[in-house]
Amino acid sequence: MALPQSKLVCTVEQYLEFERQSEERHQFIDGEIFEMAGESLAHSRIGTNFIRELSTTLRGKPCEVLSPSMKIRSGPHIKGMRNTKGLFSYADCLVVCGQPLFHDDHKDVLLNPTVVVEVLSHSTQSFDRGDKFRRYQTWNESLEDYVISWQTRPRIEHFQRRPDGKWLMEFVEGLESTLRLESIDCELRLSDLYDRVEFPEDLPEEEAQFPIGSPPSY
C-alpha cells in the first residue's frame, strides 16, 4: 500500500468518522492519520490480478476475497473516546475464512484476515516488511499468510505462520513459478499474478543489489 503524504493527530473514533466521510483513503497509526498516495499502473494490475485469481479459486469455498476498501484493525480494542492506539490499514488484497469479525456495526474494519497481500513500492517497503507486519503478527492471530509482491520483477516474499506460531519465509520468483497458500488450499501461477505487467529493464538502485535468488535487507 502507498505510504502517507500528510498526517493529523486524533483518536480512533475521530479517525473512523473522518475516514467514512472521506473520498480518499487514509491509514491510522497510533493517533496519526496518513493519507494514502496514488499507485502505479503495475501496482494496480498486480493487485487486480490477485483479486481476480483468488476470487476464481475460492468460489464455492468457505473463504472469500474482500475489496481493498476494507480496513484491517491491528491493535487493542479500547472503549472510550480517548483511544489513540493501534493500526487501521488497507491491503491490496485480503482473504477471510469463516465468519468475518468486525470492529463495529459499520462492518468496514476487519479483525480476522486469513491472507493479506501487499504490492511493494519504494515508499512502502520498510513499513510493509517492518512495523505493519509486526502488528499483524501481534494482533491478528487469524493471519496465516502474508504476501509481499514486487512490481519491478516477478518476485514474491511469502510469510507463512507455522503451527508453533513462528513464521516461515520463502521466495517465489519467475513467471514459471507457483505461489502455494496452504491456509486456503490455493495455488497461484505468477504468470497470472503478473499478467500485463511490464518490468523495467533497469531496476531501482536499491533493488539492483538483490539479484534473483538473494534476500532483500530488512
Where would I find each of the regions flagged by the language model?
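Gly/Pro/Ser/Thr-rich low-complexity, intrinsically disordered segments predominantly at protein N-termini
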Residues: 1-218
